[in-house]
Amino acid sequence: MEFSILLVGHGSRAEQGNVEIDAFAKQWQAHHPEWQIHVCFIEFSEVLLDAGFDLAAKKSKKVIVVPLILNAAGHVKMEIPEHLAQARKRHPDVEFIYARHLGASTGILSILKRSLQKTMAKIDMPDPKTTGVIVLGRGSSDKVANGEVAKIARWLWEETQHELVDIAFTGITFPRLESAVQRQVKLGMTQICILPYYLFTGTLIERIARQFANLQSLYPQVSFSLGKYFGFEPEIYAALDERVLELVDAKQEHMMECDGCHYRQIAQEHGHGHQH
């Protein structure tokens, strides 16, 4: 075939997270039976980046590498490009093209708005004036990645009637969920919707569920509602379709900026190669 696709998931210590990504890839393949879609993971899997690149390279002379990742932090900017560079050396006759990550987009915003609607429906008195919203991201040492969470939260505020839409992170950076909830309670919110900004399940989703239960006990006067991670939403498939189709002709302007970037080497020399 003309090209093959390598879908790169993050990987999770929780086996179900990787199972969901495999199932997602099978559904995407069903949408496009003429494509060859392979899956690998950055970590916590038997099939990691090098094995994924080698497998895809055996199937065609053009491989489109698609990161199934919301925010461009260390894995997207550093780790995948590093392994991609090595794959090009191992397979000099194969053209590898690195697609853009998902990022903040109108499609992702649509998913987040639906999640908010569903969480509001679980609240006894769904009044946006008294219901705070917290968009809960993974957290990164990369300010641009954290900024994407802030951007999507701002977009959500722009398109809803909620007076208070905050961001929080499960790790690496701040504010954390508990601090964001404390702030909203002090500002008079009697109901709080927490929206995980995650694609699939994993250990962090499990941690969020425990934090949610703890918050309910700490603030019995507040009605909390927890949204689901994004999962198998049609907008995710549509975004990946766009990533592939814009690269079929290998147009430079649609490639991931970090592929071949000389600043990546500088960052590696300063010890910033593997960070979320």
Specify the residue positions occupied by each region the protein language model found:
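Active-site-proximal alpha-helix that buttresses catalytic centers in soluble enzyme cores
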Residues: 1-276
